Amino acid sequence: MTENQNPAIDENKLIAERRGKLGKLREKGLAFPNDFRRDSYCADLQARYGDKSKEELEEASVRAKVSGRIMAMRGPFVVIQDMTGRIQLYIDRKGLPPEQLENVKLWDLGDIVAAEGALHKSDKGDLYVNMENPRLMVKALRPLPDKHKGLTNTEMRYRQRYLDLITNEEARETFRIRSKVIESIRYFLTKRDFIEAETPMLQVIPGGATARPFVTYHNALDIEMFLRIAPELYLKRLVVGGFERVFEINRNFRNEGLSTRHNPEFTMIEFYQAFADYKDLMNLTEEMLRWVAQEALGTTEVRNTSKNTDGDVVDEIIYDFGKPFIRMTVVESILHFNPELTLGDIDNMDGAKKVATGLGIPLKASWGLGKIQIEIFEKTVEHRLMQPTFITEYPTEVSPLARRNDDNPFVTDRFEFFVGGREIANGFSELNDPEDQAERFRKQVAEKEAGDDEAMFFDEDYITALEHGMPPTAGEGIGIDRLVMLLTDSPSIRDVILFPHMRPLAD
């Protein structure tokens, strides 16, 4: 078997060769210096001078100090990449001193180098820096993935995200957009007098959502603690304390399964506004998401594609955040997407059970009418909500923290926001009646005792806070990861989390 047939042998040989070159650099006192300071980024140079002619550049006598990772070596040209883009360096074999030329011979793909010199244009019209005093800043001991194939193993892209970011411009752009999304949300809210808060990640009582928590132990306090599943109850304590507009962008943790839409550690924005209701937050959310799309993408039209196994685009859909968002109640949406049904089929237990059974939904004895309606909704409606849509009036049975509707106590003043068949946000007018909240907590405790690991705990301190009086308030949570998935046309949540959770590799 030749070396070309065994990648492991090839890589070991390359690593040995690179270690030898590093040894020579150490002997010369040139290993891992930290005394170069660039004055230009690649993309900035391309933007400012890329359209200049050779003659214009020579006349302008522009000089630059650049640094980056070697991505290609083509004869006398070296292509480097920094955080903004790429530019070429030119090795002037006649103009450089012999000692510097010898050092350049120690360069390999993946090394981090630096140089200064005049800007020129090649005969092909490419911008380059005519290197003076070329420097090897970091010797890469391991080779980069094949320049044509890249890091093709999806799982390895997640495990070795640093290589994915080096070799995959699409991945870098995804995380630039993610950063811009968070930045624009923060800007939008702070400009509207919201205060950013930080609430506990370790909690004695995990609350604010129905989910299974991660359990840990605090040795000094000698108590069991939980990684938070949501910041909600602490943020509402702040509303009680007088912070009438408050938000938090941070991680939540839920000890549940992995999927293309679920990661046990994920990022959310939660925000609360006193003297507002769920309709006010729907208006705010519509305005904010329109702003975020424009800021992050430069457009309110979000393109998503479907691809075949070869990666070819076979279908495309545009989610239009520029148009007014659709608004329907849970019941209206069920009837809209199931035209064969009537209101009489789903507004009573017998009818709803019959519909659910016909859909193959396994019923549980503890379910009431509201829970069955939601199961029908999730089975027949949720995945069909493609354009930006608010679904409102969720049953009280499945909304333990939301305020009951004044006209119909069977439902709450709650909405969820969907686009592309995905739930992105959940918001409602907050329940601020301490006695009603205590009763709902008791029902959750009963469900937990009956075996529901995701049911809520009874949070007595939160009830005490409500007894001091929380103003009429509306609150909302938006899943940052799912929002970024949508905006970047990413099929998996792992594509938008820098270091997603993975099963350990087998020995």
Curated annotation (Swiss-Prot):
Binding residues annotated for Mg(2+) 1, in chain numbering: 416, 423
GO BP, sorted A to Z: lysyl-tRNA aminoacylation
GO cellular component: cytosol
Alphabetical list of SUPFAM superfamilies matching this protein: Class II aaRS and biotin synthetases, Nucleic acid-binding proteins
E.C. no: 6.1.1.6
Family: Belongs to the class-II aminoacyl-tRNA synthetase family.
Protein name (record): Lysine--tRNA ligase
Gene name in the database record: lysS
